[in-house]
From Swiss-Prot:
CDD domains, sorted: bS6_mito
Subcellular location: Mitochondrion
Protein name: Small ribosomal subunit protein bS6m
Domain of life: Eukaryota
Gene Ontology annotations of biological process type: translation
Length: 121
């Protein structure tokens, strides 16, 4: 399964309400077959500009990152689901790049005589 990062901006709320929104979001991800690896709180701060969402203007928001693995079909369904959640201001899925690891071919022995500089006679 591909690995994704879900970036969320939640409206400014008290800690219990924020925890409820995150729990709801993580449960929705797991219902759709995702494996949640990590949830990171980046803190609450002022938004770079006023964002209007669900008939409200937001000036502050809580930033969160969810690290997950899931099927490719999860992106469109979760974007639709999160777009309808009134507590989420912005959401974005970022796909992790697939890193290819190169196998080590080992150390090639070098002839010491080839490294010696011939002396001038």
């Amino acid at each position: 399964m591909p690995r994704y990062e879900l970036a969320l901006i939640l409206k400014a709320m008290q800690r219990p309400e924020t925890a409820a929104v995150l729990k709801r979001t993580v449960e929705a991800l797991m219902e759709r077959g995702a494996i949640v690896r990590n949830l990171e709180n980046l803190g609450e701060r002022a938004l770079p500009y006023k964002i209007s969402k669900h008939n409200h203007r937001h000036r502050r928001g809580g930033y969160f990152l969810v690290d997950l693995e899931g099927p490719p079909s999860i992106v469109s369904t979760m974007m639709d689901h999160l777009g309808r959640d009134i507590d989420i201001i912005r959401r974005a899925f970022i796909k992790y790049p697939v890193s290819k690891t190169e196998e080590c071919s080992g150390i090639v022995p070098v002839n010491c005589e080839d490294k010696l500089i011939p002396k001038k006679k």
